[in-house]
């Protein structure tokens, strides 16, 4: 007897769908949730942009996490600076009704000149010593200020004049006070001058080969400090991973490496985080088509600015990019939540119907 043959080709499921290279970059707009295609795209992105290795001594920080950290540090520093101004004004209002003694005024000074060990001067001696020593101006209404004829109005006017004389860009030239992270660019000086993250300090890997003083004072200040971290980055993790491994072997426990480096930043945060022009190795190659007869000219190379803080425009751009990333990642979960919420009323209505039928079936007493 002959065996029964199945209808159709048994290899039909293994047949590959022909793909056209012309439409490879076109992606579907329909979000169907997690799929094998998205998983494979994620794996390809990791292989292309990241260099994960087994038994890494250092820890990693994502670009999106670093952007959120930048936004938090900027907001806290802004609140702190504005809070200091309001605290000075409140202190001035409180001190209008009380006059402190000279001993309290001298012992409140942070430097060593007015320590409690030193002798307290009388108001007359303080006035005489003003001409020979540096006079420290405060917003408090003290006895010697009243005697010398210096009022709070004069101090306020002088402070306003000093603020007006300072340029508006001076705030961007100073790093954030008490910043919780130290950002180090481990590339050479030329690459750093071309493009770097705002607020990053240049620390070439050649510094690690020194036998004497391989670390700067900033690195030693942040080394294993409580509540502070050190972040290294480069273009594509080739140099930063080696530098991070060496520093971890030398006792750094709060060291992180920025995953992906400038290559991932150019894709996810093309503006806002960096200053200058991205290197050509970080930019994606343009797609060439048959219809394109002329090549599009690239943007001219702009050198990096000497910025230590993010401007308000930069922070707004970074916040928009972060929101877009969070929206794209939360869309599948939001769809699942919507589907769950849509199922809840049906189950609740069925429970109500069962309870109503059971109540009607019971005899009334």
UniProtKB/Swiss-Prot annotation:
Region of interest (Disordered), ranges: 1-23, 104-123, 329-365
InterPro entries: CEP41, Rhodanese-like_dom, Rhodanese-like_dom_sf
Keywords: Cell projection, Ciliopathy, Cilium, Cilium biogenesis/degradation, Cytoplasm, Cytoskeleton, Protein transport, Transport
Location within or outside the cell: Cytoplasm, Cytoskeleton, Microtubule organizing center, Centrosome; Cell projection, Cilium; Cytoplasm, Cytoskeleton, Cilium basal body
CDD domains: RHOD
GO cellular component: centriole; centrosome; ciliary basal body; cilium; cytoplasm
Domain of life: Eukaryota
Principal location: cytoplasm
Keyword Transport among UniProt keywords: yes
Keyword Calcium: no
Domain Rhodanese: 177-274
Skewed-composition ranges (Basic and acidic residues): 1-14
GO terms of biological process kind: cilium assembly; protein polyglutamylation; protein transport
Gene3D superfamilies: Rhodanese-like domain (3.40.250.10)
Positions with biased composition (Low complexity): 342-365
TM annotation in the entry: none
Family membership noted in the UniProt record: Belongs to the CEP41 family.
Function according to Swiss-Prot or TrEMBL: Required during ciliogenesis for tubulin glutamylation in cilium. Probably acts by participating in the transport of tubulin polyglutamylases between the basal body and the cilium.
Name assigned to this protein: Centrosomal protein of 41 kDa B
Species per Swiss-Prot/TrEMBL record: Xenopus laevis (African clawed frog)
Upper classification of the organism: Eukaryota, Metazoa, Chordata, Craniata, Vertebrata
Gene that produces this protein: cep41-b
